[in-house]
């Protein structure tokens, strides 16, 4: 959560949430006044998270962030995507950006965590990885900050407005 500031009361989407680990961290960060939507295309992961998160401020949904998610337009303060962007095709990148823009509030933020583009003990081949500069060029949103996340990851923050 370093680099995101206070999330108290915010509405957050954890896109491609997997088992919901980060969704649970966001749940505590947004508090009772906020809400976390956990989205993943894997039905079994979402069903397990629904059972685990019952009675919390987490709403677990099956869906694909690279297509129309049916989520309400301009409703999210933050969209978070962790270590999956490198696997998107060019069409999926376009779909992802379009859907993120649609569901983010004006001035809302997009946070993408990716693996650094150098040899690491884990992660995809180097030719699949994005440097933070390549990631900034790949999207038309306004880049805000690049934050180191440990030794092997970084988070690129964007604002939901077009680059000048």
Regions found by a protein language model. Name each.
Residues 107-114:
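Conserved beta-strand signature within the Rossmann-like core of class I S-adenosyl-L-methionine
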Residues 147-164:
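Core SAM-dependent methyltransferase catalytic element
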Residues 7, 66-79:
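A short acidic, Gly/Pro-enriched loop at the edge of an enzyme's catalytic core
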Residues 30-31, 88-89, 104-106:
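Helix-to-beta-strand junctions that scaffold the AdoMet/dcAdoMet cofactor pocket
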Residues 13, 19-67:
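Class I SAM-dependent methyltransferase SAM/SAH-binding core
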Residues 77-91:
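A short SAM/SAH-binding and catalytic strip from SAM-dependent methyltransferases
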Residues 94-106:
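A short glycine-rich, Lys/Arg-flanked "PGG" loop and its adjoining helix->strand segment in the class I
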Residues 1-10, 25:
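Conserved alpha-helix/loop element of class I SAM-dependent methyltransferases that forms part
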């Amino acid at each position: 959560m370093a680099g995101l500031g206070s999330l108290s009361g915010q509405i957050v989407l954890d896109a491609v949430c997997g088992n919901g680990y980060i969704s649970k961290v966001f749940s505590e960060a947004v508090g009772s006044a906020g809400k976390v939507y956990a989205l993943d295309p894997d039905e079994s992961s979402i069903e397990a998270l629904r059972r685990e998160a019952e009675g919390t401020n987490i709403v677990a949904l099956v869906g694909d962030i690279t297509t129309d998610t049916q989520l309400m337009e301009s409703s999210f303060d933050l969209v978070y995507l962790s270590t999956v962007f490198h696997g998107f095709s060019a069409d999926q990148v376009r779909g992802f950006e379009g859907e993120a823009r649609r569901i983010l509030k004006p001035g809302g933020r997009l946070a993408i965590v990716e693996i650094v583009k150098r040899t690491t003990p884990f992660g995809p081949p180097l030719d699949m990885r994005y440097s933070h500069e390549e990631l900034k060029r790949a999207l038309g949103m306004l880049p805000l900050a690049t934050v180191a996340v440990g030794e092997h990851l970084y988070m690129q923050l964007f604002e939901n407005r077009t680059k000048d």
